[in-house]
Structures are given as structure tokens and as C-alpha cells.
């Protein structure tokens, strides 16, 4: 009768702790608990229509990246890819605002979960999936040991860091240069397109600027163990 239609009660509304992806179809949040039994909610940042991330303790230190891809034409469901850069306890909760289905990924305290690359989720495109599911990520991905050094470059051969478009970025006030390359199953290869978020972290995409493939961060832990920590989370 001329009155505007009300927004559905369950429509996703983005805020400081809520990430809305796929044109607000999915409502995403994460809660955490650390080793001192402190708890909180992740702080959300939207990166694109299908990608976003969360930080827990410091805005310069991102802890989790998530993306949701419409895979209806391939597997008949929406795909959920996420990775974490923390070993605190966390629950990543994803809710489909259209079907009201809820998918929860649980990471126990002390497990450095690398997350999940899930192409067969409960979010079936025809709405036929179960109402809820909880996945314990520690079952498939126990805490790893010391990271393996892949390659080391003589510091004498490295000059001052200078950004080069999106092929090379500088972090920690120019101390570190970040570059990336990729190769696929068909023999294709190329440079990663890098995006600097802040002095401690950034992202990379390979094929599509809306499809983030990697989160990386550097943490100054010199006062703890004399090192700068390097963490990388891939979504591919």
C-alpha cells in the first residue's frame, strides 16, 4: 500500500565483527579464545564480494582470511575456502541468510590450523543441504613442526626495497620486500598481484582481482625469540 518493503530479519548487515559476502547472502563471524582464557570476536574487513579477513589482537596482524565462491555450475554448492594464521581456539561461523543454514569450523586451542578448502559444503545451490554442520579442523590438520626453509638469498645481493607496482611491495617500513609467483596444473605461470594492507601484512591475487589467493604477514618478535615471524595463508 505504498509502504517500503522491510528488509528480511536475517539479511546480512556488515559491521565491525560481521563480514557479508556474495551480495550479502552469507553472514560470517569468528570468535576466539587465547591461552590466557581471554575471549573476543574477530574484527572484519571486506576485501571483495567473495573475500574478507579478520584480525583479533592488533589491526596490523591479520589472523584469518575467508572467501566464498559460487561453485553451483561445478559441484552444485558454494565453496568455502579459509585459512588461519593463529593457534588460538576459534569458531568461524558462516550463515546462509536465504536458507538459514549454519556451517561452523572449530579450531581447538593450540592447533595451528591451516583451515579448509571445502568445495562440497552444506550450502547446496538447490537448498537441499542439512540445516547445520560443525567441522573440527584439527582432525585433518594437526599442529605442524618447525617450518622448512625453502630458499635463502645472500643479503649482500639485495638492495633497498622499492615498490614495483603490484609485483613487489615493501613491509615493515621498507625492511622487507615481498614478491610472489604461481604455477598451475596446466603449465601456466605468472607473477602474483600484491596488495599492501598495512606495514605488517598484505594479500595476493593471481587470476581475478575479486578472488584473493593468499594472506601474508610479518610480526616483529625480536623481544620474544630474536626473529621476525613470517606467516602465509594460501586459498588455492
Where are these regions (language model features)?
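Polar/charged low-complexity regulatory segments
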Residues: 2-236
Amino acid at each position: 500500500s505504498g509502504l517500503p518493503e522491510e528488509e528480511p530479519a536475517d539479511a546480512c548487515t556488515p559491521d565491525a565483527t560481521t563480514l557479508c559476502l556474495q551480495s550479502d547472502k552469507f553472514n560470517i563471524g569468528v570468535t576466539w579464545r587465547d591461552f590466557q582464557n581471554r575471549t573476543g570476536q574477530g574484527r572484519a574487513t571486506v576485501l571483495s564480494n567473495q573475500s574478507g579477513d579478520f584480525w583479533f589482537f592488533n589491526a596490523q596482524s591479520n589472523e584469518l582470511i575467508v572467501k566464498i565462491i559460487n561453485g553451483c555450475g561445478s559441484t552444485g554448492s558454494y565453496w568455502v575456502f579459509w585459512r588461519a594464521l593463529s593457534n588460538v581456539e576459534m569458531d568461524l561461523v558462516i550463515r546462509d541468510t536465504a536458507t538459514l543454514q549454519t556451517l561452523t569450523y572449530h579450531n581447538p586451542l593450540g592447533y595451528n590450523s591451516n583451515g579448509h578448502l571445502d568445495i562440497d559444503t552444506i550450502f547446496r545451490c538447490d537448498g537441499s543441504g542439512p540445516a547445520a554442520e560443525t567441522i573440527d579442523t584439527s582432525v585433518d590438520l594437526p599442529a605442524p613442526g618447525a617450518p622448512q626453509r625453502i630458499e635463502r638469498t645472500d643479503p649482500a645481493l639485495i638492495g633497498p626495497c622499492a615498490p614495483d607496482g603490484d609485483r613487489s611491495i615493501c613491509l615493515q617500513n621498507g625492511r622487507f620486500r615481498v614478491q610472489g609467483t604461481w604455477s598451475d596444473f596446466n603449465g601456466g605461470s605468472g607473477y602474483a598481484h600484491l596488495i599492501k594492507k598495512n606495514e605488517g601484512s598484505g594479500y595476493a591475487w593471481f587470476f581475478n582481482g575479486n578472488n584473493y589467493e593468499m594472506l601474508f604477514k610479518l610480526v616483529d618478535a625480536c623481544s620474544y625469540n630474536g626473529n621476525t615471524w613470517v606467516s602465509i595463508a594460501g586459498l588455492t
